């Protein structure tokens, strides 16, 4: 037979093949080499989203990756196709080329039915031909805040913003205002007369407790201790998703400041504030408990700094005067993400007197909050 008939030409199916060569010499020494061989009819290949770029996967958008294969040059238009895992219909988006790296941002991603996330798969395309490599990613969860409609309450002096005093997500200064038994009072309470839906809203009322001014407040976390009528607070809870806004409903009554000082003077109108922050704080410990942040109202150096190194996103809204009428009004606090990191914790704080940390404000100020919601899809804010 001819020499040619001894040579077999193998036509590999498109894909990545692993070949392992193992060679052992006469002395028993062994060497193993692994090769990755890419069989492809096109000049591009899909690439998984790199570990150091996981921050490019959000709840409703993600950046897809591909590459131009070495010593190959695409001859047709480059794009990506993507779909939810388990569905049949692909969507297509143009690829952006930077050297050999291909990317595309896809938006409008939706959760799977009855899930807080979804799984997507994608392939890079050259013309009408898809790369043989298919990659997947899972979107961030569209988590919501617990008891965000403030329907669950228990106890009195202190009143808890939860069904049980042993398991709560929110807390308030009620522990401090109830610590002097003869003058015990709750600053933050359930109110059935002002609400958007359900049974209650949260009412935050600023008051004078004995000789000290106390702002009506609530926050994600736990009131840890009272030291000489000063509160020590653990702020924040674990949270790894990235909403684009906090929305809710508010009614605010701004009193005339009667406990003025350095930050707001007597006779001025008091200010109410709600703020939200996401960060990767290392954690601080008090009394054996570790919290993302610990605020000691005796020490201004412990107060929250929105420009702190570990703040990944921050948004706030201040009300300089009373809201109109007796109804609640919608508000939107957008979040600006400044860092290419994924948070570990979330902080939300509301105060009927913005400068309550400094014991300044008005005993005539009250704030009602209801139906807080974390928004993940920008298009919801445009409606």
Where are these regions (language model features)?
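Short, small-residue-biased leader/transition segments that mark boundaries at the very start
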Residues: 3-8
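Surface-exposed, short loops/turns at beta-strand junctions within beta-sandwich domains
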Residues: 10-16, 106-118
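Extracellular carbohydrate-recognition regions
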Residues: 42-44, 134-179, 383
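Solvent-exposed loop/turn segments flanking beta-strands in beta-repeat/beta-sandwich domains
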Residues: 1, 68-86, 270, 343
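Short, solvent-exposed loop/turn segments at the edges of extracellular beta-sandwich modules
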Residues: 24-29, 127-129
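Short carbohydrate-recognition loop motifs
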Residues: 192-212
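Terminal, low-complexity interaction segments
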Residues: 282-382
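Exposed beta-strand face motif in extracellular beta-rich ectodomains
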Residues: 15-19, 116-122, 344-346
């Amino acid at each position: 037979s001819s020499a040619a008939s001894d040579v077999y030409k193998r036509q590999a199916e498109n894909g990545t093949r692993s070949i392992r060569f193992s060679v052992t010499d006469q002395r028993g020494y062994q060497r193993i080499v692994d090769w990755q061989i890419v069989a492809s009819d096109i000049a591009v290949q899909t690439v998984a989203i790199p570990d150091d770029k996981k921050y490019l996967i959000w709840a409703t958008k993600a950046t897809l990756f591909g590459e131009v294969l070495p010593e190959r040059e695409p001859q047709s238009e480059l794009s990506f196709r993507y779909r939810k895992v388990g569905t049949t219909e692909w969507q297509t988006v143009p690829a952006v080329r930077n050297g050999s790296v291909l990317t595309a941002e896809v938006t409008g991603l939706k959760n799977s039915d009855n899930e807080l996330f979804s799984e997507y798969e994608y392939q890079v395309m050259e013309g009408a031909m898809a790369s043989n490599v298919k990659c997947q990613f899972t979107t961030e969860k569209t988590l919501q805040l617990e008891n965000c409609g403030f329907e669950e309450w228990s106890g009195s002096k202190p009143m808890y913003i939860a069904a049980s005093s042993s398991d709560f997500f929110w807390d308030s200064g009620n522990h401090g205002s109830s610590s002097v038994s003869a003058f015990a009072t709750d600053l933050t309470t359930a109110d059935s007369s002002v609400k958007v839906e359900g049974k209650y809203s949260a009412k935050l009322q600023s008051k004078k407790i004995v000789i000290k001014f106390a702002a009506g407040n609530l926050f994600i976390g736990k009131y840890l201790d009272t030291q000489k009528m000063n509160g020590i607070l653990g702020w924040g809870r674990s949270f790894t998703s990235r909403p684009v806004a906090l929305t809710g409903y508010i009614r605010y009554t701004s009193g005339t400041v009667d406990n003025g000082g350095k930050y707001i003077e007597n006779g001025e109108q008091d200010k109410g504030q709600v703020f939200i922050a996401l960060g990767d704080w290392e954690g601080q410990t008090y009394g054996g408990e570790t919290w993302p942040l610990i605020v000691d109202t005796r020490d201004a150096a412990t107060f929250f700094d929105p420009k702190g190194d570990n703040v990944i996103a921050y948004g706030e809204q201040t009300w300089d005067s009373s809201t109109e009428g007796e109804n609640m009004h919608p508000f939107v606090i957008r979040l600006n993400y400044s860092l290419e990191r994924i948070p570990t914790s979330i902080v939300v704080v509301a105060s009927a007197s913005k400068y309550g940390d400094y014991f300044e404000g008005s005993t005539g100020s009250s704030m009602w909050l209801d139906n807080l919601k974390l928004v993940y899809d920008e298009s919801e804010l445009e409606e």
